[in-house]
Amino acid sequence: MGVTVQDICFAFLQNYYERMRTDPSKLAYFYASTAELTHTNYQSKSTNEKDDVLPTVKVTGRENINKFFSRNDAKVRSLKLKLDTIDFQYTGHLHKSILIMATGEMFWTGTPVYKFCQTFILLPSSNGSTFDITNDIIRFISNSFKPYVLTDASLSQSNEENSVSAVEEDKIRHESGVEKEKEKEKSPEISKPKAKKETVKDTTAPTESSTQEKPIVDHSQPRAIPVTKESKIHTETVPSSTKGNHKQDEVSTEELGNVTKLNEKSHKAEKKAAPIKTKEGSVEAINAVNNSSLPNGKEVSDEKPVPGGVKEAETEIKPIEPQVSDAKESGNNASTPSSSPEPVANPPKMTWASKLMNENSDRISKNNTTVEYIRPETLPKKPTERKFEMGNRRDNASANSKNKKKPVFSTVNKDGFYPIYIRGTNGLREEKLRSALEKEFGKVMRITAADNFAVVDFETQKSQIDALEKKKKSIDGIEVCLERKTVKKPTSNNPPGIFTNGTRSHRKQPLKRKD
């Protein structure tokens, strides 16, 4: 079985704290060259010994970390600690790095015990068998949890707030009582609705007399139809006046409730009585016109013009059996002769829109047919048509430029080696570059150097991959970039008139007339 993450973390923490206690000057070898450290600031002296948190300082780089631990060697050696918890996770690129968080207690000679939390990030080295510290942060945890106790000042403030709130509530109640009294004083007087009632009764009196008077029709004269218009006018005035009476009754006060109810009942009875009488009068007039005859002995037909809008009413009337009680029929017989026809209800009037819909109903139902369009099948193109669809020089040139923009990387060259591209080698000797690369990555077969870059061929692919993952390396104080090598762009030796894709340019030639 291989080594687990738990084994790596426990072994690292044991060696780290053991090296801190035995030889702090060699503790910097655990860190990477660009590591960052946040540790206890041993140089600052706290004024209060009862403080449970110590100041910290940040150090960057392996050399500065080595100087920090060497300067405070005696203080670091006296460290004693106890670990309570250890947590760890994979992190970083491809989850190869390890994140460790340890909590516990530590102290030095002559100091109290401090609670701390220390976090590490371990990065695997190039060979993969060792790890380097890239980040190290320590944080001291405060232990000052003070209980909350009520003092005299806080109690006095709470009492003052309660007294202020009680005074404000009293003011609000007093203001609301004054507003209610003002509203009662501004309430409407009772005498005003009485005057309105009298006017209502006066207005309804003429309408009742007008509706009760029946039109007198002479059967010998065919021009008795305008009487129906007047009766219709009377019937229309009654509902309008009664609507106004209902609105005025709603304004009345509660004290006159009983009086208004009686008036409403009387108005409703008048409403029901008035339309029935006017309808009977209008029907009698219409029937009289239909039964009358002209002086020359010809009967009046529906096709002949009639004054006013009466023709529409005559054409629309259909006989309907009246649903009237026996008491009403007896009353009507007493006032009218026994030969009077039975009343017929007026059908609803036809509007221009309803007539238009009835006329066009047949047309609309017939024209609801749907038309389906079938797309013709695509025919294969002839070879002559394909020639004209070929791109011109600009299209081919743009296509070639797009293909050239995509870089092609070389993993293995023709000699079987694995090349990489190194940028920023200005002022760096070839021998030092070779020795540094072979020491960290593996055997170098060939180096092709220029002014500010170099191409290095490794023997194995593993060395190439490790170098590319490193990305940057510092050699003799010069930082170089390790990148992938691209393939050389092919030179075009095609003759003029032929493109890189092998197609020829098509020139238009003048058409020759056939004799």
UniProtKB/Swiss-Prot annotation:
CDD domains on file: NTF2 (cd00780)
GO molecular function (one): identical protein binding
Keyword match Ubl conjugation: no
Signal peptide range: none
Phosphothreonine modification, residue list: T336
Keyword terms: Phosphoprotein, RNA-binding, Ubl conjugation pathway
Basic residues bias spans: 504-515
Gene Ontology biological process terms from the UniProt entry: negative regulation of mitophagy; protein deubiquitination; protein retention in Golgi apparatus; regulation of ER to Golgi vesicle-mediated transport; regulation of retrograde vesicle-mediated transport, Golgi to ER; ribophagy; stress granule assembly
Domain of life: Eukaryota
Biased amino acid composition, Polar residues: 202-213, 330-341, 489-503
Short name of any one Pfam family annotated for the protein: NTF2
NTF2 domain location: 8-140
Disordered: annotated span: 157-410, 485-515
Domain RRM, first and last residues per copy: 418-494
Compositional bias segments (type: Low complexity): 157-166
PROSITE patterns in the cross-refs: NTF2_DOMAIN, RRM
GO cellular component, one term: cytoplasmic stress granule
Chain positions found as Phosphoserine: S187, S282, S340, S398
UniProt cross-references to InterPro entries, sorted A to Z: NTF2-like_dom_sf (IPR032710), NTF2_dom (IPR002075), Nuclear_transport_factor_2_euk (IPR018222), Ras_GTPase_bind_prot (IPR039539), RRM_dom (IPR000504)
Compositionally biased residues, Basic and acidic residues: 168-201, 262-282, 299-319, 374-396
Misc. comment: Present with 11700 molecules/cell in log phase SD medium.
Self-association and partners: Heterotetramer with UBP3; contains two molecules of BRE5 and two molecules of UBP3. Forms a complex composed of CDC48, DOA1, deubiquitinase UBP3 and probably BRE5. Within the complex, interacts (via C-terminus) with CDC48; the interaction is direct and UBP3-independent.
Function: Has a role in de-ubiquitination. In conjunction with UBP3, cleaves ubiquitin, leading to the subsequent mono-ubiquitination of sec23.
Protein name: UBP3-associated protein BRE5
Gene: BRE5
